[in-house]
Amino acid sequence: MSGNAVIESLETRRAVRSYADRPVEREKLEAILEAATYAPTGMGAQSPVIVLVESKETRDKVAALNAGAMGRDTDPFYGAPAVAIVFGHKDVVPTWFEDACLVAGNLLNAAHAVGVDSCFIYRAKEVFETDEGRALLKEWGLDGDYVGVANCILGYGDGPSRNPGKTGT
């Protein structure tokens, strides 16, 4: 359906795995996070929570925990300056996981719509099951049964995407 801006945006978004050392503008981050909250949720509960990590120290700490969960000594966030971590709360609605995934999807698509590159990074659950991860949750004021669902890295790509997109459909 050529000519439809929403469809074109969905079809042209790519995962970016190399980032320039350049912060994302505040107004773009706010627009991305706001759009993410418009995802549909079970029973309209709107229970997922997003924590935006921009501090290099905290970002590097979460990246190290993620790399440890992966069993590699690498930066799983590919140098991205910001990470939006999406959490679901197990006690609010039975669809907490699906709801958090929809929020992450909205977040990634909103980033593309405002010209910010992104990538979905796994292992949020494993990171926030560790003692260090639970300490971060407490520091961020997230008490209760919050589960990490998605790390959405945000920034500006350092070069063209290597991912050509979907073919053969």
Task: Label every model-predicted segment.
Residues 1-169:
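Acidic, surface-exposed loops and disordered segments
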